[in-house]
């Protein structure tokens, strides 16, 4: 999946990421841009507008939780399926999340990283992260197959 150089670039860069901010923004943007994903978060309260979503404390907290799991996954780039097995089971068997949503969130995360880091998020680094989010999405969807 990733070369040793790509792994080093991804994990090295991740140390600069403010997980709480990026996670909140990524999940918020997912819910705004793909409103059908809101059905999994109806218990989060007011999701009636983009502004309400982006300022919703439960969205922010869950976004951080999602990126905390992503951070843990970065420690296991050679075994993403193993690293995300329990989350895959939860999202498939209990929550019944459409696995396509994992791909969408990964793509949103890459956009948010680019927005936060500008030129420091180089095209090469973007390509590396795209590989990672694709791998994570596939790992999360593994239980569905």
From Swiss-Prot:
A Pfam entry, by short name? Globin
Q: Name one GO biological process term.
A: hydrogen peroxide catabolic process
The UniProt family comment states: Belongs to the globin family.
Identify the tissues in which this protein is expressed: Red blood cells.
Give all Phosphothreonine modified positions. Answer: 11
**PANTHER family recorded:** HEMOGLOBIN FAMILY MEMBER, HEMOGLOBIN SUBUNIT BETA
Task: Report the protein's function.
Answer: Involved in oxygen transport from the lung to the various peripheral tissues.
Designated gene of the protein: HBB
What residues bear S-nitrosocysteine in this entry?
92
Taxonomic source organism: Rangifer tarandus (Reindeer)
Positions where N6-acetyllysine occurs in the chain: 58, 81
> Which key words are in the record?
Acetylation, Heme, Iron, Metal-binding, Oxygen transport, Phosphoprotein, S-nitrosylation, Transport
* Stretches assigned to the Globin domain: 1-145
Q: Does the keyword Repeat apply?
A: no
InterPro entries for this protein: Globin (IPR000971), Globin-like_sf (IPR009050), Globin/Proto (IPR012292), Hemoglobin_b (IPR002337), Hemoglobin_oxygen_transport (IPR050056)
Descriptive protein name: Hemoglobin subunit beta
Q: Which GO terms describe its molecular function?
A: haptoglobin binding; heme binding; hemoglobin alpha binding; metal ion binding; organic acid binding; oxygen binding; oxygen carrier activity; peroxidase activity
User: What are the binding positions for heme b in this chain?
Assistant: 62, 91
Q: List the disulfide bonds.
A: none
Kindly indicate where the leader peptide sits in this chain: none
Q: Which Gene3D superfamilies match?
A: Globins (1.10.490.10)
* GO CC annotation terms, alphabetical: blood microparticle; haptoglobin-hemoglobin complex; hemoglobin complex
The entry describes its oligomerization and partners as: Heterotetramer of two alpha chains and two beta chains.
